[in-house]
Amino acid sequence: LSISDKIRVTLAQQRILPDREVNIMKGLSLIKRALQVKANIVILPEVFNTGFYRHNYESVEPLEDELSLLLKISEQKDIMIIAGVAEREGDDLYNSAVIIYRGEITGKYRKTHLFPLTDEKKYFKAGDRLEVFETPFGRIGILICYEVRFPELSRKLVKMGAEIIVIPAEFPKERIDHWRVLLQARAIENQVYV
């Protein structure tokens, strides 16, 4: 990315509810609002489809089915969607983030550091690698929520070529000041956009 490149990014703040279908429709509504302000990229929260409501986990469909409405809108409109999702693969469930562009899932990251205080490892399988994704808007690395607390993860993404680090999260509102400091620290330490 050069200093003259401009990218409009919309952070879709959404209250995650116990109803999976309502969450997906709300996410779609927020994407449509991002289109109104001519966003290039819209970022949905961590596990935006299910939240951490365990009763939702059993009904999670394969990604292409779970995210069919998002795939469709990204195909029709010129917008990249980065969404935190509960992803099912066989019997395993992952806390993942996907990059959707032009009707396709063009990148997928599975959370490697599961949050111990909420027993994520009891429900989700950990991912096994960091990745940087080449996109029309630059090289994007992804972490998910709790992983912002590990500076070495951001550093590794930058060493792998990341110019932007996206961190979908479901971070508690009560600690939002803490969240902002963590994001600023990762940006300053690595001299990249977070």
Residues covered by each model-derived region:
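Beta-strand-turn-beta hairpins that frame and shape the catalytic cleft
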Residues: S2-V9, V132-G141, I164
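Active-site catalytic loop in hydrolytic enzyme cores
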Residues: R88-M160, K173-V181, A185
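Alpha-helix N-cap and loop-to-helix initiation/capping positions
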Residues: V22, K26, E58-D65
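Active-site beta-strand/loop signature of hydrolases that rely on acidic residues for catalysis
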Residues: V9, I31-E61, I81-I82, E147, ...
